[in-house]
Amino acid sequence: AELSAIRGMTAGAASLIPDRLKTYVSWGHHDTVETVIKSGMFAPMYVTGLSGNGKTTMVMQACANLKRECFRVNITSATDEDDLLGGFRLINGETVWQDGPVVNAMRRGAVLLLDEIDLGTHLMMCLQSVLEGKGIYLKKINEFVAPAAGFTIFATANTKGKGSDDGRFAGTNIMNEAMLDRFDWTLEQEYAPKSTEKKILLKKMKSLGFEDKDFAGRLTEWADMIRRAFREGAIDEIITTRRLENVVKAFAIFQSRETAIDMALNRFDDDTKTAFRDFYAKLDDTIDTVVDTTTLDPSTVMYLDTNFSQKDEVKNRGARWDDQRRKWHVTAETVNLDPEFWNQFNPTAVETSPF
């Protein structure tokens, strides 16, 4: 038992306490999570909600505030007993038992965070007795491990364990009801209110060396507009808090709201990208609305979103430089001749061509 406990540890105790994030804003269920951890009672909790809204961060920052050790385990469809409880490993030419993160957390009375648990399969059923707080029998080394005081479990998921019918969360599975029933409570995590999300973005901006309250306000209003449309079934995609933070990061690098928005939207299909960009353009007149170039007068000017390394590429294909706007531009007619090439530069209509 002593050998397995020693060789099971691969990190110092201090490194198991999450770092406190300067950009973190406490909101929603944070106080509930912190209260449960502080109580020292075993009370497994299931936290569910759409992606990128801070479920995992909330648990880890609660541990950081309380200076509690946290073992975060990222669950996949391949996660099994060997990954969770431990197994025999070849170390320095010798085969020894090494505890897995679940057993390590139990021995140390730490918080166990099962991240994206709904990606797991029946191979995780080895956790049933652990979820009951009764400890675990390690049959391969004939040892029973009882949980130390303070041990508890949190699981995060995008679904409630019933899979994803719309395909948004591909890979999630229908979880075993007996496992789900072993969680004491379920917390439903929504996206942060606009006022809270703005605070999150402002803290992110400050961490990157700038502050733009106007931009932060427009971004949160934009995300709220899209989420309302999503809830009403008008659109199939959504803007997460994580994606808003990525917009802020892009702005810090490129110093352009337009570029920051476009970079964040590139992961979506063309129709969604155009719709989301148009949503933002309604809130910020510094951003031009993307339109269907085939419906425009052929002489309409289309400004391009390019970086310095692309200037020769667009120039050689007929683009001209506008000193006032500091942008390259072509006509709608030019775009229509090779839309696949020009659309990568997000051409936006502004005015009738001066040439």
Model features per residue range: what roles?
Residues A1-L296, V350, F355:
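C-terminal regulatory/interaction module of P-loop NTP-utilizing enzymes
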Residues V291-F355:
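Accessory DNA-engaging acidic/polar modules
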